[in-house]
Amino acid sequence: MKGILGVKVGMTRIFRDDRAVPVTVILAGPCPVVQRRTPEKDGYTAVQLGFLPQNPKRVNRPLKGHFAKAGVEPVRILREIRDFNPEGDTVTVEIFKPGERVDVTGTSKGRGFAGVMKRWNFAGGPDSHGAHKIHRHPGSIGNRKTPGRVYKGKKMAGHYGAERVTVMNLEVVDVIPEENLLLVKGAVPGPNGGLVIVRETKKAAK
């Protein structure tokens, strides 16, 4: 299952058949192959890819040995992609073609501590008719004797965002190899400049 590491550049639109298509621009690769996992040695097939060059002074000794063994320059990011055994020593954006479908994984924007209305779309309490200081409250979180407790997983206020999110089955609209750019239809998780992993989709289009 082929894949590549990239950085979300931002969103724009392109025109296709006189219609505007919203696309996310991803700067993908080139990613050097740092390590290969094999069923004989590791019990599974995978490839470890690197992305974004790193200052050698900021690399610790174990990683320096890891990069030297692979014969690659130090990189800032290392990620494994399972069931992928690419040819050659570098993975580029050319592994994808327009019209293919991909899954994009990233870290959603962190929004800090959020209440139930923002975090879970609760309606909140009434604004008037005697309502006092409950306008944005969740309401009851558990009855008296039954159940007499708060269920695990109850939707309440708390930390919102900054989670690993995968958006599936996005269409590759265009590939620009000379600039290492990948254009996918729709939105992908995370802020501009955030790390994303683009993989061949697990879900075929219906």
Curated annotation (Swiss-Prot):
Keyword set, alphabetical order: Ribonucleoprotein, Ribosomal protein, RNA-binding, rRNA-binding
Keyword Cell wall biogenesis/degradation: no
PANTHER family per record: 50S RIBOSOMAL PROTEIN L3, LARGE RIBOSOMAL SUBUNIT PROTEIN UL3C
Subunit structure: Part of the 50S ribosomal subunit. Forms a cluster with proteins L14 and L19.
An example molecular function term from Gene Ontology annotations: structural constituent of ribosome
NCBIfam families: L3_bact (TIGR03625)
Matching Gene3D superfamilies: 3.30.160.810, Translation factors
Role description: One of the primary rRNA binding proteins, it binds directly near the 3'-end of the 23S rRNA, where it nucleates assembly of the 50S subunit.
Protein name per the record: Large ribosomal subunit protein uL3
Organism: Thermus thermophilus (strain ATCC BAA-163 / DSM 7039 / HB27)
Underlying gene: rplC
GO cellular component, one term: cytosolic large ribosomal subunit
Family: Belongs to the universal ribosomal protein uL3 family.
Lineage top rank: taxon: Bacteria
SUPFAM superfamilies: Translation proteins (SSF50447)
GO biological process, one term: translation
